[in-house]
UniProtKB/Swiss-Prot annotation:
HAMAP family in the record: LpxC (MF_00388)
GO MF assignments: metal ion binding; UDP-3-O-acyl-N-acetylglucosamine deacetylase activity
EC annotation from Swiss-Prot or TrEMBL: 3.5.1.108
Role description: Catalyzes the hydrolysis of UDP-3-O-myristoyl-N-acetylglucosamine to form UDP-3-O-myristoylglucosamine and acetate, the committed step in lipid A biosynthesis.
Protein name as it appears in the record: UDP-3-O-acyl-N-acetylglucosamine deacetylase
Entry cofactors: Zn(2+)
Entry-linked SUPFAM superfamilies: Ribosomal protein S5 domain 2-like
Gene behind the chain: lpxC
NCBIfam families according to UniProt: lpxC (TIGR00325)
Record GO biological process: lipid A biosynthetic process
InterPro entries referenced in this protein's UniProt entry, alphabetically: Ribosomal_Su5_D2-typ_SF, UDP-acyl_GlcNac_deAcase, UDP-acyl_GlcNac_deAcase_C, UDP-acyl_N-AcGlcN_deAcase_N
GO cellular component, as recorded: membrane
């Protein structure tokens, strides 16, 4: 059967919070079968747990924020994307502040941490949500939708009226049966416009943002000396974000996600709509790995 997965060992890292600019200590720990991904604020006494579920999303301004009462953990999407890409079902994520460290602005450092900790299969079937019917949410010209598909595929389109985006590939369709999340998606960094960053800083936000953890665009060009990691890094980062946001279903997906100009807010809205539409999905497990439409990197490779 396709089994649930957790980490083999705990692992620690330190980074800065994107919004506070303060140092954040991060610890990833193994968790038991069916625990899911749980964020834990260890700077509070007693510590407060927030399960990584769509209904616990309390804010989607600039990042995806999970809440439990008045306790928050923001910028969870890049770490969630790494968990999804490596098929981790169960883990405790301890943070010493109200946001996950931004690292280099991609999921790459989190992939490295998880692979360094090692991946442990658990003796229980991995659960998947299989899309049975189309579910669409629109907001003006923005759109996000689920479609039935025997595998996992993400199609994303972006549109910016800006010189840097002219002549660049602004859409991507990634079929994960033939594309490696680790190689093709995980290293795509978040991006922002200089004028927006200056405005946000004036409001006390993105204090930790820099050319070390984002692709920054001014009026005419990319400001990062080393340029882009992929020609289509902008849209690939949107795919990365979407994978992290979708993993707040609490299980892996069998289906296609199509989005146009969607962000964290619409990603979350369509998840909530899907959950309400109980005729549009079913929970499935696989006794035989060979019959499954999705496969994951073998744990032995990730030690």
């Amino acid at each position: 059967m396709i089994k649930q997965r957790t980490l083999k060992n705990e692992i620690r890292a330190t980074g800065v919070g994107l919004h506070t600019g303060q140092k954040v200590y991060l610890t990833l720990r193994p968790a038991p079968i069916d625990a899911g991904i749980v964020f834990r604020r260890v700077d509070l006494s007693p510590a407060v747990d927030i399960p990584a579920h769509a209904e616990n999303v309390g804010d989607t301004t600039l990042s995806t924020t999970l809440v439990n009462g008045d306790v928050r953990v923001s910028t969870v999407e890049h770490l969630m994307s790494a968990m999804a890409g490596l098929g981790i079902d169960n883990a405790i994520v301890e943070v010493s502040a109200d946001e996950v460290p931004i690292m280099d602005g991609s999921a790459g450092p989190f992939v490295f941490l998880i692979q360094s900790a090692g991946i442990q299969e658990q003796n229980a079937p991995k659960k998947f949500i299989r899309i049975k019917k189309k579910v669409v949410v629109k907001d003006g010209e923005k759109e996000a939708a689920f479609y039935p598909f025997n595998g996992f595929k993400v199609s994303f389109g972006i549109d910016f009226d800006h010189p840097v985006f002219k002549g660049r590939k602004l859409d991507a369709t990634i079929d994960f049966s033939s594309t490696s999340f680790v190689k093709e998606i995980s290293r795509a960094r978040t991006f922002g416009f200089m004028h927006e960053i200056e405005y946000l800083r004036s409001k006390g936000l993105v204090k930790g943002g820099s050319l070390d953890n984002a692709v920054v665009v001014d009026k005419y060009r990319i400001m990062n000396e080393d340029g882009l990691r992929y020609d289509d890094e902008f849209v690939k980062h949107k795919v990365l974000d979407a994978i992290g946001d979708l993993y707040l279903l609490g299980t892996s997906l069998i289906g296609e996600y199509r989005a146009y100009k969607s962000g964290h807010g619409l990603n979350n809205q369509v998840l909530r709509e899907l959950m309400k539409r109980e005729d549009a999905w079913e929970l499935v497990t696989f006794d035989e790995e060979e019959t499954a439409p999705i496969s994951y990197i073998k744990p032995l490779l990730a030690v």
